[in-house]
Amino acid sequence: MANFDLTRINCQFLDRHLTFPLLEFLCGKEIYNQQELLEYILETVNKTNMIDYTMDTRKRLNLSQEMPDELVQRKAEVLATLKQLQNEVAPIMKATDILKNGESMKDSKTFVNALQKDYNFKVEHLESAYKLAKYLYECGNYQESTSYLYFCLIVMSPNDKNYLNVLWGKLAAEILTLNWNTALEDLTRLRDYIDSANFSTIQALQQRTWLIHWSVLVFFNHPKGRDLIIEMFLYKPLYLNAIQTMCPHIMRYLATAVVINRTRRNALKDLIKVIQQESYTYRDPITEFLECLYVNFDFEGARLKLHECQTVILNDFFIVACLNEFVEDARLMIFETFCRIHQCITISMLADKLNMKPNEAECWIVNLIRNARLNAKIDSKLGHVVMGTQPLSPYQQLVEKIDSLSMRSEHLAGLIERKSKQNNKESIDSWKYY
Amino acid sequence: MSRFFANGSDSESESSEEEVQAPNFNKASAFQFSDDEEEVKRVVRSTKEKRYENLTSIIKTIRNHKKIKDIPNTLSSFEDLTRAYTKALPVISKEENGITPRFYIRCLAELEDFINEIWEDREGRRNLSKNNTKSLGTLRQKVRKYIKDFEEDLSRFREAPDQESEAEDEEAHVSDAGEAADDSYAGFKKEASVTAPKIAKSAPAKSVPADDEDSDDSIDWDSDSESETESSEDENQYQNMRERFLKRSTEKGEDKGDDDKRKDKRKEQKLKIRKRAEDDEDGEWETVVKGHVVEKPKMFEKDAEIDIPLVLAKLVEIMSARGKKRTDRRLQIDLLFELRDISDQHNLGVPVSVKIHFNIISAIFDYNQKISEPMKMEHWALLLEVMQSMMKLLLANADISISESVAEEHEEYITAPFYIRGCPLAAVERLDDEFTKLLKECDPHSNDYVSRLKDEMNVVKTIELVLQYFEQCGNPNERCRIYLRKIEHLYYKFDPEVLKKKRGEVPATTATSVDVMDKLCKFIYAKDDTDRIRTRAILAHIYHHAMHDNWFQARDLVLMSHLQDNIDAADPATRILYNRMMANLGLCAFRQENVKDAHHCLVDLMVTGKPKELLAQGLLPQRQHERSAEQEKIEKQRQMPFHMHINLELLECVYLVSAMLLEIPYIAAHEFDARRRMISKTFYQQLRSSERQSLVGPPESMREHVVAAAKAMRCGNWQACANFIVNKKMNTKVWDLFYESDRVREMLVKFIKEESLRTYLFTYSNVYTSISIPSLAQMYELPVPKVHSIISKMIINEELMASLDDPSETVVMHRSEPSRLQALAMQFVDKVTNLVDVNEKVFDMKQGNFFQRGNMGNRGDRGYNRNQNNQGGNWGGQRRDNRNQRNRNQRGHHKNQQQQQQQQVQTIDEE
């Protein structure tokens, strides 16, 4: 399944620290050579300050149990730097702790003022706080890093050169500490900042591409994310354009999100348009599934693709949690489309198309009928499902049209009435002048 | 679609006015002309003398007018002259055996030269008064028309020794006069024996008056010879003098002696002039040329030490004559070549050589004074050669930098970093333009064109050299310009390697033209700061992609560049390129099975009915002076050379076929829909014109084939349809023009099958309750899943009221035909809906402006209308006016509505 694996591409757009979960996930999947993967992880880890993680990886690679001197030395160095940075920031943090309890915490401006007035706060302090946060992050201490970053965000003005970095750092740290709620907040803040800041076109595109990749992590883990991902990727032209030009592979996640979101069925049409447009740059079983089902009405193809989808999802870190939902919803989609087209279906064929056993399928359909989601009857003697839908009679059509007509006229009349009332008042007013 | 005619020649309007008027003048004069002819019937004795006298006097006035450049008067005198000549015509034919008298021809020749000179001199022409300009145009046309009758005489005159050569206007006037006089003298000697008796006979009658007048003029011959008109008078004098010599040479001995004296002086001047080797010179001239060869070394003093400053000084001296009216341009070129040889002989170094090369190039460009006309072939060859050798020199010597930014005084020829002023970029651009002009000049179907086209290689090579040079040392801007030149030679050429590479037949590392194009264009996208170069590069890039079937890349480029939005603001050449690009994109979409997109791309071009004009592949036949000659000239300059043309028949066929594939199923689906819109107007026109024919024969032309196919498709007969579209005739006419024609044909048949199936289902679904899918598949020779998919799509889109019955594999139709009453009711509802739509629209529209604060929206309900009328009385004057007016409108509106509704009810009743 390596040919549908997107980890390699996704990692290009993620922070070094964000890639570790992905890589670790892959280790458990046996798609790639375990040894090579671990070596790659080691190499990546070496670029950070996470000494313990490095050691752990070395152990897994069966390298010497002893810590090499070089590493020992580095560890000492790291600790020393950390100490130094902490010392620099300590007074200001103490002050913050004190102020936190007071009134001045409510508003960032008053807070800054209070800091400056009472504790001799300077810009250099902010600088060192930022450095410390960065250093902590690099050491893998995300929790503490967030608190410093939070401080920075409050104190910093949006014009500061580090402001964007702080935003990014905060988002990364929140993601890594699995704080999805705050991560979502930070995500929106970062997005607003990117949209409003004056980047050159190419920079903005780059920033958005990164944001898109990071946000996928958040969206699939936050309960509200499934609506938001559609909202952001599909209905914000700037982001849709970014996906189309820079990273069409994001279509996979967008498609998954649409499939598992039953309430947003109308997004499907737009999605399919985009998929068709980009079909030459990116295709994978998930987009192909939708294409088969809604463009070509090739149910056999859809069935096969659905089968492939399962393995793809199983091996994708981002969406692995949605596997069952996806399969269930995809089946429903196939069935719905089927029902719209057919008036009589044999259960055995249906079972075949849905990748189910006939008994299971019958049971499934019975459940659907029982839940009143389907107007149909089962002819068990012949093994058929007969749809109960009747086409619109001309009479009904007529009534429907007239219905809308009367609605519209009423609305119009209402408007007019309001206007005339207003006018009456006006004319009465004008009377007074005579 | 007047994409590029919109602002084509606004600036030319003034001159075009003048052109329009010209024919009227001609008509008038022609009328008078014939009138006079009738009068001439009476012949009187001694007419000849009278007539000739008349003629000479008019000629004299013309001369005087010319002298002060009084063009309107010249024009009227010229008209007098022609009239007088017509009068004299019978006499001439009788007395002179129909030979036109020389002085008359001479006058005509002079006049022509005079006009040409003024005409050429654009600067001067612009400064002329409006009246003068107008007359000049008229005069020029008249003279041109008139002298056609005398062409033979004129050419003989120009050849003959007493001529004042065509280049008269370029010559130093004094020497010119001398030459002419000399010529007439020499010519006299030669000719004397032949013509003597004849002239002798006629001379006495005429020479006396002419003599008197002319000798008066000739008194101040030497001092007053500044203007060339004067000098030509002198020539005339000598002609007369020759006649005098014939009769009484001894009497005029004094005159002759005078002549001889001057001759010595003139000889020197003459030698200089003779140097240019006229093609049409006779043997007598050649000896003079030889004389010049002897003189050549005169360029430098015999024992002068030839070094760089000297050569440069000479160069400056030669070039300073550039652009002057009487400079002999050919002489200049020759001199420059000579200078180059000299500098090469003396090893003066590469920089000097480059400089001279550069000057040769500009001299060659200068040779041709008319911008619209191409240069001569031999010059062209010379130019290419010089250009290439110069570029080679430049490339071989990296320490020379040549650019426009170097000021004259900072040029450096002696020590190492050399600086030369000049711009090879401009030169190569001009060279390229000249090449296009050359191509456009010759007939595209002749071998001439092919042989000319072979030079394309050389041009590309030259551009390549310049490009190399600028890649070494050139700022991004210049590189963009030269890249664009290369792109413009590249983009329309098909490279089969690209397709092979796509199929993996050649290794992926081979550099194809698409790769080259990519590289060049990307550089321009990144570096260019003038919008025009980028736009053109994008257009060419898309064109190239489309040509090689890179449909998606081409489409994305179009969409991302947002060209459609602002192409209307571009210059005509760019708009033409845009149209060409669109045409090609349409063809590409068609090849890539995107019929709808193909139609979209082509519809703008085809709907106007003049794709030929829009693609600049020929002018439409002119209707009633739609454009003036000036405008036509401009449009001609824009035309594409033939080898870059897009086949129009192919284009139209692709358009019509894609329109057919879209339109026919649509017609079938919406047969009874009141709101049906046509997709393609052009296609409808074709259909209608075929329906108008009382008898439709078997199709002959491409259009007839498509129409016949469309008719077959309407009854779902795919076989017939496919046969009409794909057959031997259509193959040779259209489809074989595609690179992979077989694939295209297969695709076409596939589409025809599918669309025919859809049409069939739309058209005949009401006669079936159910249709078996396998039998449909058999009928249309399509695989069952495909049929299934097509029908499913139709059901989902609610085009077909049916559903599938899986166990029996049939389509069950649900479409219950509405009863008559129901149908009418539906129609009625549709119309009422329209009414409500209109109401809403009116409401929305009025809401925005004046009526916002008033009670205005009462159109919906008649009751309010009445109320309002009552209120109306209470309102102030101005307001009341408004109100009443509005009420009237409203009432009118309501009346309309009522009428409409009544009508509708009536129609329903009738039905």
From Swiss-Prot, chain A:
Residue span, PCI domain: 219-392
Signal peptide residues on this chain, from the entry's feature table: none
InterPro entries, per database record: eIF3e (IPR016650), eIF3e_N (IPR019010), PCI_dom (IPR000717), WH_DNA-bd_sf (IPR036390)
Keywords: Cytoplasm, Initiation factor, Protein biosynthesis
A family per Pfam: PCI
PROSITE patterns assigned to the protein according to its UniProt record, in alphabetical order: PCI
Gene Ontology BP term (one): formation of cytoplasmic translation initiation complex
Superkingdom in the source lineage: Eukaryota
Main location as per UniProt: cytoplasm
GO cellular component annotations of the record: eukaryotic 43S preinitiation complex; eukaryotic 48S preinitiation complex; eukaryotic translation initiation factor 3 complex, eIF3e; intracellular membrane-bounded organelle
CDD domains hit by this protein: eIF3E
Function: Component of the eukaryotic translation initiation factor 3 (eIF-3) complex, which is involved in protein synthesis of a specialized repertoire of mRNAs and, together with other initiation factors, stimulates binding of mRNA and methionyl-tRNAi to the 40S ribosome. The eIF-3 complex specifically targets and initiates translation of a subset of mRNAs involved in cell proliferation.
Protein name (Swiss-Prot/TrEMBL): Eukaryotic translation initiation factor 3 subunit E
Organism, as annotated: Drosophila persimilis
Swiss-Prot record, chain B:
HAMAP family (alphabetical): eIF3c (MF_03002)
Superkingdom of the source species: Eukaryota
Low complexity biased stretches: 196-208, 897-911
Gene giving rise to this polypeptide: eIF3c
Protein name: Eukaryotic translation initiation factor 3 subunit C
Assembly and oligomerization: Component of the eukaryotic translation initiation factor 3 (eIF-3) complex. The eIF-3 complex interacts with pix.
One Gene Ontology molecular-function label: translation initiation factor activity
Main location: cytoplasm
Domain PCI: 642-818
Compositional bias of kind Polar residues: 23-32
Region feature Disordered, mapped onto this chain: 1-38, 155-181, 196-284, 851-911
